[in-house]
Every structure is written in C-alpha cells, then in structure tokens.
C-alpha cells in the first residue's frame, strides 16, 4: 500500500508541476528526499494519504500573484501560466507601401463614338508647297470659230421641183463647214450666226428664193417681174445647234423664176459666220 500510494502521489505532483511550469525545479528536490530516506536506517512512518495530498496541494498551488483567484479550485486540466510569453508581432500598413510598376495590359475593345463636337476656329495659312510636275496633255479643244462665203457664176432657172442652189466659187470656208457638193452649211459650233444672201434678178422674170434651216422656210428673197434686172439681198441671224443645216432653195416653176449670173462675174453670193458661241455668257 505504501509503494502504490507513493506512485500515485508522484504522478499527481508531476501533473501539477507541468501545469504550473515548476516541474524542472521540483523533480531534483523530490529525488533528493528519497535518497535521504533510503540512506537512513529507519524510515519515517508514511503519513496518511489524505494528509499528504493536502500537503502537496498546498505546496504546488499557484499563488495569487499568478492571476488566479483564491476561491477558485485548480484542476489538473487547467492551463497554467505560459513559460514563454508571446512577443508582439509588428504590423505593417500595406496601404502606404507602393509596389513596382506592372506590365502593360492587353488593349481593350473600342468604345462608342462620342457626340460630334463643334467646329473649331480657322487655322493659320500653311507654307506654300513645292511646284508640282507637269500633267499629261489634254484633249484638243474644239474651235469656237465658223465662217464661210461662197458664190455662183452660172444662171439658174426653175422647173417643176424645188432646187437647192449649188455654189461653184469658194471665197472663205473655215474648217470646211460649208459643203460645196451639197450646197449646205453644217453647224459644228453651236451658237448665234449671221447669214446674208445676194442675187441678181433676170429681166422679165420673177425671182423667188428661201433661206432654209433644215427643212424649214425661214426667210424669203423675192423680186417681181421688171424691165430691168436689179441686185436683191436678204440677211438674218439664227441660233443654231450642232448638226443644224442652212441652205438656199429656188422655188418651183409655177411661174417663170430665175436668177442671173455669168462666167466673167459673180452675181450670186451666200455668206455666214459665228457671232457668239453658245457657252459664252
């Protein structure tokens, strides 16, 4: 009973010492007392189990300075005072720390177009640029001139049909706008033209001609029957478009109708020229 009680007591003391942090200081003292008891011839009588338990409890009970109240019972599972007090860990305010600049991110999607702004002020005139190279030659422009003057040296008499007066003498025919074979002037330059017709009448015969525009009778040249021949003329201005035709027509022979001329002299003339081009203001 004595050795078993001592074992239980020793285990109880070790638990109390571990809990209170005094195990290292108390274990050698207990071992020394046991050696003294073993060296004596007569061992003291072991105290009662209850008394020894109270004595050990009083010896190893934590003092009031350690923070436990006197009225509180200490159990073997209660935590004791820590042998190594925790040190305060310094705190770092990460909001004041600035890290290194990161890599550039990927390009984002294009945003929507904003509202159109107001027009800015007119800028300053820039410096004069260098002279450019010469361009390619352009197309040849059309001539803005037209003129003709023709004559006839042969007399002409009417018959049962209308006759175009054909001229055999060319005085002026700029750019060949007057066709000597057909006896007609062809308009290649649109604009305002002046025309003049001069004839010599025949004695005792009527003179009856028209200046024609395309197939339209425009003006008449007329002379009644007379004992003497005379020079008769007619003139006018016409506005022509391209491809219009102007010519002279002898009236058909309801009555005897004729114009006089001879090989030695020119008695019949027809002239015309451009006064104003159509594109001119």
UniProtKB/Swiss-Prot annotation:
GO terms for cellular component: collagen trimer; extracellular space; plasma membrane. Residues 99-140 form the Collagen-like domain. Transmembrane segments: none annotated. Residues 48-62, 100-109 have a biased composition (Basic and acidic residues). GO terms for biological process: negative regulation of platelet activation; negative regulation of platelet aggregation; positive regulation of aldosterone secretion; positive regulation of cytosolic calcium ion concentration; positive regulation of gene expression; positive regulation of MAPK cascade; positive regulation of phosphatidylinositol 3-kinase/protein kinase B signal transduction; regulation of glucose metabolic process. Residues 1-25 form the signal peptide. The keyword DNA-binding does not apply. The keyword Signal applies. GO terms for molecular function: collagen binding; identical protein binding. This is Complement C1q tumor necrosis factor-related protein 1. It comes from Homo sapiens (Human). The gene is C1QTNF1.
């Amino acid at each position: 009973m004595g050795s078993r009680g001592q074992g239980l007591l020793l285990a109880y003391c070790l638990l109390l010492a571990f809990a209170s942090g005094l195990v290292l200081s108390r274990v050698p003292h207990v071992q020394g007392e046991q050696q003294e008891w073993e060296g004596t011839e007569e061992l003291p009588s072991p105290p009662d189990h209850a008394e020894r338990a109270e004595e050990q409890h009083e010896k190893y009970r934590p003092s009031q300075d350690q923070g436990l109240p006197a009225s509180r019972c200490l159990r073997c599972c209660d935590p004791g005072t820590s042998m190594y007090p925790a040190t305060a860990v310094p705190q770092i305010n990460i909001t004041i720390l600035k890290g290194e600049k990161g890599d550039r991110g990927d390009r984002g999607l294009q945003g929507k177009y904003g509202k159109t702004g107001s027009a800015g002020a007119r800028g300053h005139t820039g410096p004069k640029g260098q002279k450019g190279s010469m361009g390619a030659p352009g197309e040849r422009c059309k001539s803005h001139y037209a003129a003709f003057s023709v004559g006839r040296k042969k007399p002409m008499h009417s018959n049962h049909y209308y006759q175009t007066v054909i001229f055999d003498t060319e005085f002026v025919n700029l750019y060949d706008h007057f066709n000597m074979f057909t006896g007609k002037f062809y308009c290649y330059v649109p604009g305002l033209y002046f025309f003049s017709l001069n004839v010599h009448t025949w004695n005792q015969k009527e003179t009856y001609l028209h200046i024609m525009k395309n197939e339209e009778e425009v003006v008449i040249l007329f002379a009644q029957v007379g004992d003497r021949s005379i020079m008769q003329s007619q003139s006018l201005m016409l506005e022509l478009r391209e491809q219009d035709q102007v010519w002279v027509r002898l009236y058909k022979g309801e009555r005897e109708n004729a114009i006089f001329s001879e090989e030695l002299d020119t008695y019949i003339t027809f002239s015309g020229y451009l006064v104003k081009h159509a594109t001119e203001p």
